[in-house]
Design a protein with these regions (language model features):
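Mixed-charge (Asp/Glu-Lys/Arg
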Residues: 1-36, 41-169
Length: 169
């Protein structure tokens, strides 16, 4: 029996959540409903010794169970992200990423979603890969992701701005 697209998506979200949380660097919140621009909200588990904050980021998950999930020419995962979805994700003020999932191998491919011209309409690159059962290799990539999220938030100087914000309420 073939899986429905909703089930394929749900399985993909679980795979991404597992890969992100397996090293203890992140916690992932499953939203439990359809959000137009993203599927997961993730948060850094702060290292209190490094005075880190629980900075958050968004993830749009695209999954496939296709027997041939990669393009032949350049080996990109055939999990297209339509421009309207990409733009909606980029419009959110949090750092945002796309995770493509090959359900045949449970491998997760991460790409940044900051650039409207990224070109994920037909497929996504396989450069940043999280492999099931390869925690050592995954840790290095997840540390890059963590640093990326921290750099984003620190670049906004949110730690200075928020305490000085004057609410109208």
């Amino acid at each position: 029996m073939a899986l429905t697209s909703n089930v394929i998506g749900d399985i993909g979200e679980m795979e991404v959540s597992t890969r992100l949380m397996e090293t203890g660097l992140f916690i992932v919140f499953l939203l439990g409903g359809k959000v137009p621009a993203f599927d997961l909200l993730a948060e850094i588990v702060p290292d209190t010794n490094a005075q880190e904050k629980p900075y958050q980021f968004l993830i749009q998950v695209k999954s496939t169970d296709d027997a041939n999930p990669f393009t032949q020419a350049d080996h990109r995962l055939k999990t297209p992200v339509l421009n309207d979805k990409l733009n909606a994700l980029i419009d959110r003020p949090l750092p945002s990423y796309i995770a493509g999932v090959d359900l045949n191998t449970s491998e997760v491919y991460l790409v940044p979603a900051f650039d409207r011209g990224a070109g994920y309409g037909g497929s996504i690159p396989d450069t940043f890969r999280l492999v099931k059962g390869n925690r050592a290799a995954n840790t290095a990539l997840l540390q890059l992701l963590k640093n990326d999220v921290i750099d984003y938030w620190r670049g906004l100087d949110i730690d200075v701005y928020k305490p000085s914000f004057h609410s109208a309420l």
